[in-house]
Amino acid sequence: MLKLLCLLLPLVAVSASPIDLGSQKDYLVLDLPGLSHLSETQRPTMHAGLLPLNLSFVADDDTEYFFWRFSKQDVDRADIVFWLNGGPGCSSMDGALMELGPFVINPKQEVEYNEGTWVEAADVVFVDQPGGTGFSSTTNYLTELTEVADGFVTFLARYFHLFPADVYKKFTLGGESYAGQYVPYILKAIMDDLKSDSGQLPKELYLKGALIGNGWIDPNEQSLSYLEFFIKKELIDIHGSYMPGLLQQQEKCQNLINHSSGEASESQISYSACEKILNDALRFTRDKKAPLDQQCINMYDYTLRDTYPSCGMSWPPYLPDVTAFLQKKSVLEALHLDSSASWSECSARVGSHLKNKISVPSVDILPDLLQEIPIILFNGDHDIICNCIGTERMIDKLEFNGDQGFTEGTEYIPWFYNEVNVGKVISERNLTYVRVYNSSHMVPFDNTPVSRGLLDIYFDNFEDVEYNNVSGIATPVYDVDKNITYIDSNDPRLQNGPKSSSTDDSAAHGNPFFYYVFELFVIVLLLCGLVYLYQYYSNSAPHSILADKHKKKSKNKSKNVRFLDDLESNLDLDNTDDKKDNSVMSKLLSSMGYQAQEPYKPLDKGANADLDIEMDSHGTSEK
């Protein structure tokens, strides 16, 4: 009787789906072009296909979300990561086939193994969302981030009905760029659902945390950082004839932000006048004498060039091969898609509908999330559109868990990968921030093995090291074929033996002892329930991923603005308190010989100015 109860437990935990989703075998991906060339250890177990949502808040809904799930063969991971790309309207197949998935696509449109795949550390599920993105389809395009979040919760309910064992894995939500809006909204919706007596999700779901890369979380801070970024990276001539126009646009953006009341009914995700700063900067810095494909700075990686006005829209360079791969009939069939299905990286229609006239920027809900779960924000330092300056200034001003920003005495810690300093990390009160060196808007695209180190930091899978008298942390280096982990090159190898799989589809793994192992698994599952309760209550308090010994105590807190600090010697700009940002801009204006019609000063946010403010979707895809 006990045996029967244990076997039925995963099914009881997930509420019945009103839709016939079939079985896991119906979604199994058995072959792909080039897969036979990979070693057995490099071939993941894969499931993919469309899940119908039947959204309750949409009449006659026909929305279907496409997912692609990867896990290591014969290995039962304790963690599962759901990954979302941004846009809005950009497919998560970017993440699956150009960033952190187990494959990259070669010029023959065949899969090759991705040496740094996150699938070595966790199961990973890539989801095209909202409807109309990538392979996902709909005739009912969503208009608010709250709707996007509710739609994803419905998708998860369908998914966990199909994969009930995944409910008991530690759930992490990850994404990049515009997913900086998606992820916080979805996290909030998941939390609300789990607390509701009528929620769609199983109560056993353990929400571990989130990772957001180059996130477009605070559009205002990002917009105000563009000009500073161009100046600091010497991408622009501060004495150029176009500078007064750029400064005027910066001032207009600042005034719009200052006049915003901050109330949900009047807030907007972004202002077109603020987005115009980046567009103008790219236009003014165009090199018309250069070859056509070198005339514009790549907004996703300032070290690269592109045609104008694309300015990075034709990047990454592997995109044509990915597109051709996903249009192959054999691939569509393997992914359980109709032969007439079409794929494009980004959908303008999704972005044009997602107006967010009611939804507030996700930075406003970030503090509440940080009370519940740890979140890692990471930024590649070559990105312009969602640059590290904007993210760091957002954190400086963010009030969370009893304080503003990271407190004085909380220091950046150097991060080493394979004895190379690849970034710096700071962590406190459930928030961790990582600046990743020599990386673009898509950090995993530039160096996937290093990006997996972000997951190791998130999993507390690192150790304290010292290289050349510099103390820091080091993340593992993985040897895939031998399934061995290195903490650093001087430490002995740590053997990670394969574990039995938790999936209920024996054909997926070809394990002849599967059913015996499964019986053992469900028994262990009951014990894990006790562990879950312990983790839930022990992790409820905000904490720092980094050890306390990296933090220096200080009685006094003093916050300085780093705005234009590289120019201080030339422009005679003093470090200024956060509350006086505008006075710093005023000094910059004066140093350029530019005088505004009115003094540039902070405006009363409560002032009822009659402003013609109109929000539109990003003119450039955030991928």
UniProtKB/Swiss-Prot annotation:
Signal sequence coordinates: 1-16
Region entry Disordered, spans: 597-623
Identify the catalytic residues.
177, 383, 441
Q: Which residues form a coiled coil?
A: none
Which residue pairs form cystines in this protein? none
Q: Which reaction does it catalyse?
A: Preferential release of a C-terminal arginine or lysine residue
**Where is the chain membrane-spanning?**
513-533
Per the UniProt entry, the Enzyme Commission number(s) are 3.4.16.6
Q: Which family does it belong to?
A: Belongs to the peptidase S10 family.
Could you tell me what this protein does?
Protease with a carboxypeptidase B-like function involved in the C-terminal processing of the lysine and arginine residues from protein precursors. Promotes cell fusion and is involved in the programmed cell death.
Task: State the name under which the record lists this protein.
Answer: Pheromone-processing carboxypeptidase KEX1
